[in-house]
């Protein structure tokens, strides 16, 4: 499934080649959970070999735990593809607007692993809708809390 999403996104970006420009993929790393701060720059290097220009927003701090959030989200203004690996962010409105503007553009989006629960605003916060909305409305998959269902095991004698 991930391969299909990536393929379709890259195909959509290939249209930029028709205009003589490299498609620009922007990676937004918004957590250190599962080490995307290491894997996303490697993935960016791989797609550069395929002819993409890449920008990796990957601060030295863990944006999930640091109030500074994510720097240079303005890079999304020139993106042909946005690739998110985020988790439980509480970024301020000045940062969030760059993401929402990109989403309104209708350009392709790919979300990895924890991006279904990319935001974690308090219940009364004006941006609280993004807590479930990013996964559900943008990525097409709601966040299902792991370990929330029953696990059943039956050992068969053999």
Predicted regions and their residues:
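Hydrophobic h-region of N-terminal signal peptides that target proteins for export
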Residues: 9-19
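Aromatic-Pro/Gly-enriched surface loop or interdomain linker
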Residues: 20-79
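A glycine-rich, often tryptophan-bearing local segment used as a flexible ligand/cofactor-contacting loop or short
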Residues: 84, 88-158
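A generic local structural motif
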Residues: 13, 67-71, 96-97
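Sec-dependent signal peptide recognition
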Residues: 1-8
């Amino acid at each position: 499934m991930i391969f299909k999403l990536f393929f379709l996104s890259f195909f959509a970006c290939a249209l930029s080649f028709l205009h003589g420009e490299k498609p620009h993929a922007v990676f937004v790393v918004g957590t250190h959970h599962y080490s995307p701060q290491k894997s996303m720059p490697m993935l960016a290097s791989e797609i550069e070999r395929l002819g993409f220009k890449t920008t990796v927003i990957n601060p030295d701090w863990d944006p999930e735990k640091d109030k500074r959030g994510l720097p240079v989200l303005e890079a999304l203004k020139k993106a042909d593809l946005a690739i998110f690996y985020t988790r439980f962010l509480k970024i301020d409105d000045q940062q969030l607007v760059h993401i929402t503007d990109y989403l309104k553009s209708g350009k392709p989006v790919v979300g990895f692993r924890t991006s279904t629960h990319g935001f974690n605003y308090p219940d009364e916060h004006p941006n609280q809708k993004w807590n479930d909305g990013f996964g559900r409305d943008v990525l097409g998959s709601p966040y299902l809390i792991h370990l929330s269902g029953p696990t059943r095991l039956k050992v068969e004698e053999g």
